């Protein structure tokens, strides 16, 4: 069977939910027995989002093979339950960088290097490579931004060319748009969608399906009008209504026959999607009996997308505890020794997630100290683990001024120091310790118990600094347990204080591996402890 290509574009406004639509379709096709992969095209000039501010971009999602990618890849992985790779996120910067390197090496044999064909060919190669490396039946490609953005033009041209390259039966174009509802007039407006489709057709792409994002049901009359003016079948105008829970969306799209229309267009002979388990999960999510309060102490809390995988992992772990996770967003910059008890007193559990830079670190340290001294279940992640070690050094070991060499290079007690293989690296982008690495677990520890007594667990990392082993014996003598280390025993991966209900911190990012139907184990152990603490 030829590989099938589905392209998802957006119009009218950005952040309309293209990624969720693409991920939901991926889940439906996977449940039809098809092998699916998915990728995101981002038209910005950055090579990747690794050096972008979380306020600009939100979370950086890391793949198994160490690619720093768009947060939509997190949605893709959680919905479809697949592990993506470096070909799943492509940016303008990455494409131009590769094309220019080829030009410098003389690979274009003296030709004038142009957007067409060189940039568009490179984009098409990325699409095909993503399908080839995963041996997929179907690849879904989402293009970031909206039709009409100048940055998107080479991407859309590449998508247009794909139809001629692989055949019309192997390509489908899905266009997502906003259908605004004017309360004063009491009507929906189709004109923005019509203009968006007109713009897309002007670029040579005729959409085969429209997905309309709307707050209110559109009604068949609106669908027929859009079908007529946009030249799509009435049944191929699909509603994406606002929902209480994201995981309802695949079921809503299936109820409208979206996946069947896609299969018919692409001539895919696949059985109906069995969504029984997914539906049961959604029913459970909608009817959770308990509630648990988790305080998230972070420096980017003004933009909650900066912690989207953390939030989803907490929710997933709540599901298996029959508990709705209520998150109290605590700005680390506001936390002091004087107000920490007031800010965190009602927390059933405290999580201190990752981050970079000095701002907010002292507030996080105060939150960690509060959790340790008051025996509140606490999970530290990445920088959260490093600050857990610093807090212990200062307030238990008495090492006044203990810090990280990253945050205070002049510190007398560099509890956290730069990794040896990072010392001579000057570039910031793409140079961290990235991707999947193993951690050897200490038998009898809370970490080992969380992972069902596995000897080794593999999780994704994103860091440049590590625990300074010169202090390891001093920590252990005071009851601090290093419950996870690299197989060569050189890098500290997990730390804990066994006397507390749950006081565990890890260098890696467990949230990146969590799924709604398969929550990450360390997060589950943490949320379980928080639920028990709430009783």
Swiss-Prot record:
Gene Ontology molecular functions: ATP binding; CTP synthase activity; glutaminase activity; identical protein binding; metal ion binding
Residues reported in the UniProt entry to bind ATP: 15-20, 72
Keywords for this protein: ATP-binding, Glutamine amidotransferase, Ligase, Magnesium, Metal-binding, Nucleotide-binding, Pyrimidine biosynthesis
Chain sites annotated for binding L-glutamine: 55, 355, 383-386, 406, 464
Catalytic residues as annotated in Swiss-Prot or TrEMBL: 382, 509, 511
Amidoligase domain: region residues: 1-268
Binding site for CTP: 14, 149-151, 189-194, 225
Catalytic activity, as annotated: UTP + L-glutamine + ATP + H2O = CTP + L-glutamate + ADP + phosphate + 2 H(+); L-glutamine + H2O = L-glutamate + NH4(+); UTP + NH4(+) + ATP = CTP + ADP + phosphate + 2 H(+)
Protein residues bound to Mg(2+): 72, 142
Any one Gene Ontology cellular component term annotated for this protein: cytosol
Xref: SUPFAM superfamilies: Class I glutamine amidotransferase-like, P-loop containing nucleoside triphosphate hydrolases
Chain sites annotated for binding UTP: 14, 189-194, 225
Modes of activity regulation: Allosterically activated by GTP, when glutamine is the substrate; GTP has no effect on the reaction when ammonia is the substrate. The allosteric effector GTP functions by stabilizing the protein conformation that binds the tetrahedral intermediate(s) formed during glutamine hydrolysis. Inhibited by the product CTP, via allosteric rather than competitive inhibition.
Known EC number: 6.3.4.2
One Pfam family of this chain: CTP_synth_N
Pathway annotation from the record: Pyrimidine metabolism; CTP biosynthesis via de novo pathway; CTP from UDP: step 2/2
Residue stretches making up the Glutamine amidotransferase type-1 domain: 293-535
Superkingdom of origin organism: Bacteria
InterPro entries: Class_I_gatase-like, CTP_synthase, CTP_synthase_N, GATASE, GATase1_CTP_Synthase, P-loop_NTPase
NCBIfam families noted in UniProt: PRK05380.1, PyrG
Family assignment from sequence similarity: Belongs to the CTP synthase family.
Oligomeric and partner information: Homotetramer.
Further comment: CTPSs have evolved a hybrid strategy for distinguishing between UTP and CTP. The overlapping regions of the product feedback inhibitory and substrate sites recognize a common feature in both compounds, the triphosphate moiety. To differentiate isosteric substrate and product pyrimidine rings, an additional pocket far from the expected kinase/ligase catalytic site, specifically recognizes the cytosine and ribose portions of the product inhibitor.
Role of this protein: Catalyzes the ATP-dependent amination of UTP to CTP with either L-glutamine or ammonia as the source of nitrogen. Regulates intracellular CTP levels through interactions with the four ribonucleotide triphosphates.
Record-given protein name: CTP synthase
Lineage per the UniProt record: Bacteria, Bacillati, Bacillota, Bacilli, Lactobacillales
């Amino acid at each position: 069977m030829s590989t099938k290509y589905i392209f998802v574009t957006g119009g009218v406004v950005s952040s309309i939910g293209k990624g969720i639509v693409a991920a939901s379709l991926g889940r439906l096709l996977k449940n039809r027995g098809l092998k699916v992969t998915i990728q995101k095209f981002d038209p910005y000039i950055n090579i990747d989002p690794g050096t972008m501010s979380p306020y600009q971009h939100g979370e950086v999602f890391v793949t198994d093979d160490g690619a720093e990618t768009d947060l939509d890849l997190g949605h893709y992985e959680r919905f479809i339950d697949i592990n993506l790779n470096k070909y799943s996120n492509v940016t303008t910067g990455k494409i131009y960088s590769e094309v220019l390197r080829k030009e410098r090496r003389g690979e274009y044999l003296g030709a004038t290097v142009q957007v067409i064909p060189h940039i568009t060919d490179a984009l098409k190669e990325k699409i095909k490579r993503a399908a080839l490396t995963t041996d997929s039946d179907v690849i879904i490609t989402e293009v970031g931004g909206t039709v009409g953005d100048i940055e998107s033009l080479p991407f859309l041209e590449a998508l247009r060319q794909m139809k001629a390259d692989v055949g019309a039966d192997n390509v489908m174009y899905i266009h997502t748009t906003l259908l605004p509802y004017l309360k004063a007039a009491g009507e929906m407006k189709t004109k923005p969608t019509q203009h968006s489709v007109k713009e897309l057709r002007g670029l040579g792409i005729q959409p085969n399906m429209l997905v309309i994002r709307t707050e209110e049901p559109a009604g068949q009359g609106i669908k027929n009008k859009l079908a007529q003016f946009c030249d799509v079948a009435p049944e191929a105008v699909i509603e994406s209504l606002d929902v209480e829970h994201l995981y309802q969306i695949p079921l809503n799209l299936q109820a409208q026959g979206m996946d069947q229309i896609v299969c018919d267009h692409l001539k895919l002979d696949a059985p109906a999607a069995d969504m029984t388990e997914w539906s049961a999960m959604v029913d459970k999510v909608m009817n959770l009996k308990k509630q648990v309060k988790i305080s998230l102490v972070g420096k980017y809390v003004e933009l909650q997308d900066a912690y989207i995988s953390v939030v989803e992992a907490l929710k997933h772990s709540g599901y298996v505890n029959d508990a709705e996770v209520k998150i109290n967003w605590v700005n680390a910059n506001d936390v002091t020794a004087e107000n920490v008890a007031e800010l965190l007193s009602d927390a059933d559990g405290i999580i201190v997630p990752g981050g970079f830079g000095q701002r907010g670190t002292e507030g996080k340290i105060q939150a960690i100290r509060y959790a340790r001294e008051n025996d509140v279940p606490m999970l530290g992640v990445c920088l959260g683990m490093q600050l857990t070690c610093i807090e212990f050094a200062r307030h238990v070991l008495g090492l006044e001024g203990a810090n990280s060499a990253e945050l205070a290079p002049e510190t007398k007690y560099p509890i956290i120091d730069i990794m040896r293989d990072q010392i001579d690296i000057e570039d910031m982008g793409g140079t961290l310790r990235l991707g999947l690495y193993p951690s050897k677990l200490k038998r009898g520890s809370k970490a080992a118990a969380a992972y069902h007594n596995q000897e080794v667990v593999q999780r994704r990392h994103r860091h440049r600094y590590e625990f300074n082993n010169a202090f390891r014996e001093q920590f252990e003598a005071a009851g601090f347990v290093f419950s996870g280390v690299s197989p060569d025993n050189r890098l500290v991966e997990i730390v804990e204080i066994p006397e507390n209900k749950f006081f565990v911190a890890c260098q890696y990012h467990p949230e990146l591996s969590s799924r709604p139907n398969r929550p990450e184990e360390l997060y589950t152990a943490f949320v379980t402890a928080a639920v028990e603490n709430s009783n």
